[in-house]
């Protein structure tokens, strides 16, 4: 009986050790991909899934296409890409991928599997020659390019013309700076021009309408906006260097969803994406936050030393939800993390390497009274 009693204590101890670890990760288990798996570089600025199902990762040193098994790299050194520092990715209606870099814009042709420099001149005789901050598109097939040192460029595939927007005659931005630009499902353009307000345009930037009164009390004055994301119930979600905000566009109110971490420091929100209508994922400099809009519950996931299933790095720069319901997360130091769509309700239970455990093998299970 003494042997059975000791065995029971051993099993309880092992499972206690396992479940303490499982609780730290809130039941979320990620698969990591980095340079050891074939990724060109561990800093991932941009992610997209193309129409064929391939995943694309824009890194600090090359563009990678992933088929679920292996990577194909497009790099300057191999002659398949003109510049390696990728800043933004966008797939147009024809399946071409527009690639923003720190020195201009490139276009990938899925038919020929080649990348070409976009060298067209605009109506002001300016080309896209500097850092591209953002590439996106409208519902009419137009391509919009936000640059760091130049104005906004609009490319019309129907007319094959490039036009400068929001610029003076020299092609420079006619106001301070432009941050985020996003077209919603109604083809309304939302943007941030770094003056504390948000704006929208229903005529492709011919006119900009402020969301809030321009009375000196704009809610984002002094803030640096990193991400704009329209959501359900006529709300806009704004990621800033001091947290995550929800803007109710109906009554023009702002609600703070995330502001301080457990140490009291500001939460630097770089990226936000919807996992579902009720669940918002925020990539920050201090880990991944999952905010439930219905319950207002927050889950904070961080890298855990010795845990191969935790996120590989706390600095999150990009998030993409694929068509299968999985989430791909790009980090600054740890490559890509993948969280598959959950079809079962089983929790992953495993030991931590740094804990002095009495055993790692489970021989049998026994149901409790619940």
Where are these regions (language model features)?
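Carboxylate-rich, polar loop motifs that coordinate divalent cations or form catalytic acidic clusters
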Residues: 1-370
